[in-house]
Amino acid sequence: MLRYLFEKIMLILDNYSQKKNFSFLRNLIGKKVEIFFDVGFHEGETTSLANKYFSIKEIHAFEPNPDIPKKFYKRKNNNIFLVNKGVGRKDCKKTFFTNNFSPINSFFRVNKRSKHTRLKIKILSFIYSEKINSRRNNVEIVTLKNYCLKKKY
């Protein structure tokens, strides 16, 4: 329960700053958007917010975490196309580290020697009774350029 609450608080704080960004963008480009790319879809927080601020024809949501699509497909979103890949500078395969605390999933291995990471681990250890574990996943990376060329955009 504490874990769930902590994750939700983190998302609320993130959404607060995202709302300011989306408000600024809407004033700059207007409400209608043809294509929106959500790189790092996670559980759709940014996409949900974007759908509230804009009238979006298509959302292409990239998420390399193999566990996320299972959750996503339970929702009904007819303008969202989930791409179970990461985005990078070149098409390749790369190691993606997933954790039991999903907001810290990353392509970068956790540097347990850094002061920042040690502080994070202390905070998370206080909140979670379980140890933060990483799992390696070999995932596909695509460039946005190549993705768009395949889709003929």
What is each stretch, according to the model?
Residues 1-153:
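Phosphate/nucleotide-binding beta-alpha loop and adjacent structural elements of enzyme active sites
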